[in-house]
Amino acid sequence: MRCPYCSSEDSQVKDSRPAEDGNAIRRRRICPDCGGRFTTFERVQLRELMIIKKTGRKVPFDRDKLLRSFEIALRKRPVDRDRIERAVSGIVRRLESSGETEIPSEEIGLQVLEALKSLDDVAFVRYASVYRDFSHAEDFEKVIAEISAKIARDPSE
């Protein structure tokens, strides 16, 4: 694998271990040329997914972009990286096993909202504000009222 620091074609695997509940392999690598250390992940890809944007344009599915969406919504929130990875992997697994190769971006957005709802209420509101294009304070109040009602019904969450 190419070194991200010096672009050398050689790198050595120093450690491999299962990750994401056995759905991936995490590899620690070192570059013999510059000494740079980096981590790679190997995952099974069942099929090539295409995302249909709101404009109708089709783009290849990008797992890293999905992960970044979670990271942005969860920035400075007390959620373990492991839980984020599991949520992302779960969404990817559902998309790949759906049988569809073209998936509307709205469907992914709904799955992200559902996952964030169980991870962190603040992150859910952050993501919903962008995804649902909030333009007024009332939009925030409505979502917060929904969350408050859910907490009142089940205080353990």
Swiss-Prot record:
Q: Which cofactor does it need?
A: Zn(2+)
Q: Does the keyword DNA repair apply?
A: no
Cofactor note (record): Binds 1 zinc ion.
Zinc fingers (unnamed), renumbered ranges: 3-34
Query: Which GO molecular function annotations are given, in alphabetical order?
Result: ATP binding; DNA binding; zinc ion binding
Per the record, the GO terms for biological process are: negative regulation of DNA-templated transcription
**InterPro entries the record matches:** ATP-cone_dom (IPR005144), NrdR-like_N (IPR055173), RNR_NrdR-like (IPR003796)
Q: Which controlled-vocabulary keywords does the entry list?
A: ATP-binding, DNA-binding, Metal-binding, Nucleotide-binding, Repressor, Transcription, Transcription regulation, Zinc, Zinc-finger
Checking PROSITE patterns in the record gives: ATP_CONE
Q: Where is the composition biased (Basic and acidic residues)?
A: 11-21
* Region ranges (Disordered): 1-21
Q: What positions does the domain ATP-cone occupy?
A: 49-139
Q: Which PANTHER family match?
A: TRANSCRIPTIONAL REPRESSOR NRDR (PTHR30455:SF2)
Provide the family line: Belongs to the NrdR family.
What does this protein do, in the record's words?
Negatively regulates transcription of bacterial ribonucleotide reductase nrd genes and operons by binding to NrdR-boxes.
Q: Which NCBIfam families match?
A: transcriptional regulator NrdR
Task: Name the HAMAP family on file.
Answer: NrdR
State what protein this is by name. Transcriptional repressor NrdR
Which organism's genome codes for this protein?
Sinorhizobium fredii (strain NBRC 101917 / NGR234)
| Gene (UniProt) | nrdR
